[in-house]
Amino acid sequence: MTQADELRRLAAVLRAEARPDLTYMEVCGTHTMSIARYGLRELLPDSMRLVSGPGCPVCVTAMADLDRVVALARLPQVTLATFGDLIRVPASRTTLAAERAAGADVRVVYSARDAVQIAADEPAREVVFAGIGFETTAPTIAASLLEARARGLANFSVLSMHKTMPSPLKALLELGETSISGFLLPGHVSVITGTACYEFLARDYGVAGVVAGFEPHDVLRALLRLVRQTTPAIEIEYGRAVRPEGNVVARRLMEQVFAPSDADWRGLGVIPGSGLALRPEYAESDALLRFPLELEPPLEPAGCRCGEVLRGVTDPADCALFGARCTPEDPVGACMVSSEGACAARYRYRGLDD
């Protein structure tokens, strides 16, 4: 059976078994892109709606945090290293790309270890790694920080803007803006966290969840699992990579370096305990403490509905800026910049994902 045949078969089963008025939310940016790329919405029954959630790390980074990154990049002694997606995300008044063009030392790296090596190669520079992401990337950044300390690289520091995934799901359910029937839970994050952290969804809110892989058949199979649940529960579809216990070693490494902290999420505001701050014993490597900055109040772009898209209450195409004033080439909001953003996915695959 070809992949196309399998997708048609799964879609037919979904159409036959789906109940009325189902709304499922995917909370992983890679799922968002896969759903758009393969036009999966077109295969779903009319009674089923898929909405995007707060699963894109760049997208959920608050404007105030982006402004801090820009301010750090402007310091003459600082080399600002970060992942490529962050370069073009609009802060209140500029972007890292614009600052680099104006002379700031901003470098794209593929891992935090690359930033550690820059610090080793250029001891006269203060190398700051701007870290974003969820539990997927936090352990690798923790390992890089420990490596820098072991190598005696006092010129390396981390600005941690990391967030933890289960927290925004609770915030969304508490808000109650969208009636969510179930969640497509993130595969990469769950490799690290396991599934125990999601149990509250079914226990406290009566909302089901299935950890899904990223191939189109993974997504449809996960949706079918959600449809077939008679009692809300947390299941794993992505069994080839995810175990209920997760990656204990990676979590211990993360917990050695980071501690829970309050974090500001685009579209959701401050969620207590949803961030990852460096522990006090790593204060000398904490760019937030090492480079105290006075920042102007953040400015949100007029008309941008990225925050609503991240909460699942607005479809990207319903934003007046979408595809006109806001495009991947000239983005207004973060959801149009990131490769995992809902607006970027919808724009790139428009026609397939309408």
What are these regions (language model features)?
Residues 49-52, 106, 151-158, 181-183, ...:
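Short hydrophobic/aromatic-enriched beta-strand-loop microsegments
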Residues 28-31, 134-136, 162-166, 187-191, ...:
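Glycine-rich beta-alpha junction loops
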Residues 50-57, 156-163, 210-217, 237-240:
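A generic structural motif
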Residues 1-124, 138, 150-151, 159, ...:
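Metallocofactor- and cofactor-centric catalytic cores in central/energy metabolism, strongly enriched
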